[in-house]
UniProtKB/Swiss-Prot annotation:
GO terms for biological process: acetate metabolic process; acetyl-CoA biosynthetic process. Pathway: Metabolic intermediate biosynthesis; acetyl-CoA biosynthesis; acetyl-CoA from acetate: step 1/2. This is Acetate kinase. The lineage of its organism: Bacteria, Bacillati, Bacillota, Bacilli, Lactobacillales. ATP binds at residues 15, 206-210, 283-285, 331-335. Its main location: cytoplasm. The gene is ackA.
Amino acid sequence: MSKTIAINAGSSSLKWQLYQMPEETVLAAGIIERIGLNDSISTVKYDGKKESEVLDIPNHTVAVKILLEDLLKHNIIAAYEEITGIGHRVVAGGEYFKESAVISQQEIEQIEELSALAPLHNPAHVAAMRAFEEVLPEVLNVAVFDTAFHTTMPKHAYLYPIPQKYYTDYKVRKYGAHGTSHYYVAHEAAKVLGRPIEELKLITAHIGNGVSITANYHGESVDTSMGFTPLAGPMMGTRSGDIDPAIIPYLIANVEELKDAADVVNMLNKQSGLFGVSGFSSDMRDIEAGIQAHNPDAVLAYNIFIDRIKKFIGQYLAVLNGADAIVFTAGMGENAPLMRNDVVEGLSWFGIELDLEKNVFGNYGDISTAESKVRVLVISTDEELVIAREVERLK
C-alpha cells in the first residue's frame, strides 16, 4: 500500500496530509504549530476524529518525528515502510526549477539559495526537507514549486522596466507564487464549465492571507500579480502588496525604528495589509465585524482591499482581451461572500453579474446569473492533492 505525505512547512508550523495513492484517498491530515516556541501543539484528524496534544517541539526534525509517531499511534499506518513519498510545497523555485523535482543535496542547496525570493517561506521548506531526510532517509522527497506554473509567462510580462543587466546578472524578475493553486483551480474550472482548458481564458483569484491574481490563457499563466517575491500584488492580510518603491528609502531616512531596508521589508511583510490599515486584525472575519461596529479603520482597510483586487482583475481582463470566467479560491475567496460581491459589483461594466443567492449559499461552482457575460466561479483549492500527484508522477 503506497502512501504519500504532502507537506507545507512554515517557519513555526508543519501542515501535512497523508494520501493513499494512486487512489488519492485522504487518510489523515494535521498541523504541528508553534515549533520552537512554548506549548507546541500537534493536531491530527483521521476517521472523523480530531486529537490535539501540547508537546515540546524545538525544531522541524522533532516535528517530523512526532508526525510519524502520531501516524503509528493512531493506527493510520502500520509501519514507516508504507510511506513511499514525501511532497514538499516550495514557494520560490526561481529560474532553477521550471517543474517539480526529486530532492537531493543539490536541490536543497539551490532552494536555500533562493531564500531571498521568499524569506518567510524557503528557509522553512529547507528545514522540513532536511528533517525528513534525517528521519526517513530512504524515502523519495519531491519539491513542488509555487513558481513553476508561472514559467510560461512571456518575457514582457515577467521583466521589470529597469536596466536588463539586473535580470541577466542578478535574476531580478517577476516569478509569481501560488502557482500550484492557480493550476489546480483553473483545471477544475474547466470541468465546471464543461470545456477544454485549451479553449479558455480565465482569471484566477487566490485570496487568503496571501493574495494573488493570475491571467490564464488556454491553461498557461501569462501574467500574475506576485512578483520577485510574494510581497507584490494586491493588499493582503499582513502584506502591503504593491507600493511606490521610493517609499522605502524615505522611511529609512525619517522613521527611527526603521533602520534599514530589511526593517522596512519586514514591516511591509508582517505589519501591513489589512492588519496595518485596520490596526487590529489580518482576518477578514474580524474586519467585517469591525465594519458592522462602524470602525472607520476597518471600513478603510476593507475598501482598499476590494479596490486593489478589482484593479488587478481589470488589468487581466485587458491582458486576456476578455475572459470566460473569474475564479475565486482560498480562504477568503471561498468563504467571504461579501468580499466576492463587492469585487464583482465593481466589474458590472464588463457584463459580469453575481447571483446574490448563489453567492451567499453556494460554496462551489458557478455563482453568476444566467445573463452574466463572464462566469463567476468558486472553486476549493487543493494544493496538497497536486503535490501528492507530482510525487506519484516522479516515483
